[in-house]
Amino acid sequence: MTIDIYEKINELYDKRREVELGGGDDRIDKQHEKGKLTARERIELLVDEGTFVELNPFIEHRCNDFGLQGKKGPGDGVVTGYGKVNGKPIYLFSQDFTVFGGALGEMHAKKIANVMDMAAKNGAPIVGLNDSGGARIQEGVLSLDGYGHIFYRNSIYSGVIPQISVIMGPCAGGAVYSPAITDFVFMVEKTSQMFITGPKVIETVTGEKISSEGLGGAKVHNAISGNAHFSSSSEEEVLAQVRNLLSYLPQNNEEKPERISCEQGDDYRPDLADAIPFDAIRPYDVRIVIDQVVDEGSFMEVHKDFAKNIVVGLARLKGEVVGLVCNQPKVMAGGLDIDSSDKASRFIRFCDSFNIPLITFEDVTGFFPGVKQEHGGIIRHGAKILYAYSEATVPKLTVILRKAYGGAYVALNSKSIGADLVFAWPNAEIAVMGPQGAANIIFAREINESDNPEETRAQKIEEYREKFANPYVAASQGMVDDVIDPRETRIKLIQSLEMLRNKKETRPYKKHGNIPL
């Protein structure tokens, strides 16, 4: 009997259907019972309809040890390929938990490494949908070697193309290092966990009892460890978040983010005059200022639940993408501590890597005091902010909303470390320390010898405030470029970004700097 081309074509489609079925209907049903989508269902939700093209669908493992001989897993437990999100190309991999539990082996890793290389060669973001039981133990050191190839690419492509990790199931052991190197980590509440050592091993070694969710769930990594940047209650929601994030990002480090048309003008915002309390010690939510300044509905907060004393995120100003770094006076008076320093520094460096202008809204009392902070290394961590701002060459703007005291004033994009423009509201207090503390030191003798120390202290506090703790002293010495009407803040920032659009700034040649990690 003669075999013609059409029989071979039919055979091809049969094999494709087998690959697309993954681990089979029973395992797909189990995946759905856990409230989880399959690897391919996730891809369909992430990319624009009809744009996904699969790479290396027929790859299989080549291990013949420990019972794997004859057990072939379609695609070796990972789907790789490319597609479009919001009309722009991306590359991706999606681990298939229905095939070998998504465990990573030699060929599985090669598929991921290959698609990462393709993303870098073509200058497009890489998105990893992680759902894996870890290393494939049967393949031994080949699995570990596979992780190494992925970690290497995460590292060398860092700052070259945006890298996004979405944790959609377990991510344990060595597997966690790949997401940690990427730019943003998304997690799903109750179904995704990350940890190096699992609960059972921890209990055996230390006696501590804890659940997987309590050890490494979405809430833990978003609010406590800071290892994750976003969380959602469902996989559908988290993938929509990823699509939204990608809309703010350039394709690679040689491009700028897309500037979209904006009907909102660079107009007065009258509510800004009363947006924050005039009393410098009264708290408020800095998001009120953000919402008044940026394009309506454009602010996407990053690391929302971690280190809440600083707010960072992406937004648009008249259609142009900007990165915002803002003190949060309603938490710890906006003071900087170890975690907020790390949070801000990482975000600043990301924005600089991908040509996103930085805007700082400053209202800071200083670095947070305490033995725990000092012993925890606040000196080193605080220095990261100085380093991040100093090395950044994107347009850098600062608006001092109220307080700017001490070393924190210097660290938060002051003129001395490279700010292009610094604006201050007329109520701003710029000084080594707050008027209360300064008056107690400078005028200590007069206060103590006074017949009415409290009255004298109040007078001296006001005297210090009038003489030093105002924006005009700094403006007279060039440390503030202009004192502005709060209602003009949006106008001034838009004008400044337009002026700085073609900014170019070089740095001395070096292999790389030595950031105080």
Residue ranges of model-derived segments:
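Ligand-binding clefts of soluble mixed alpha/beta catalytic domains
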Residues: 1-517
